[in-house]
């Protein structure tokens, strides 16, 4: 059964069609590149999948229990939270309890910290503390650093860590390599290759995309074409498709001129 089903989704902005009765399925293990020209509505499509905006028509069907994590294109704004707290937010309630416990320990409020320690014991929460520490290390992040002190590229690393710690069934990434240096990009590529969930990715870095995806969604003037192949094969098939369209248009123009 598909994790996500798109059933005749339609959306327009100011009479411009973004999605025109789009139907498709997203399966477990799919690693999908969402391709299209600038302004085609790729980020809007991603937000529909994330549930942050609604289509005008059609249905987005998500299998019961499926979790989705979404990394937007814009880095987070300045705030004074430390990186441990931000990553822990991805764990929901237990993340908040661990954050409060850590702050109380640092403030040496041991009696109050003991109450939170009991909650953590009851929820078997220490494993999540280890998960937070492990993913901070994986992204070379210091949990005590505040977000406001970081550049755009490092902020994206923080938000990626928060998205991945949830171990979502579906991970939506909109231009994840923006502001990153080559070392960080290569490390992220390795990480996403190892990721066992379903991935939907927007990126202008074609080399990065080619190393990861096994399927392509091509968004063109509101229409979605699905290519069941990697990025390099998609490029070949797309070129062949465009060439065939050019020949067909030329034949039509020639016939029209003769009439």
Stretches with model-predicted labels:
Residues 250-259:
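Short cytosolic helices in intracellular loops of multi-pass membrane proteins
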Residues 1-251:
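ABC ATP-binding cassette signature C-motif
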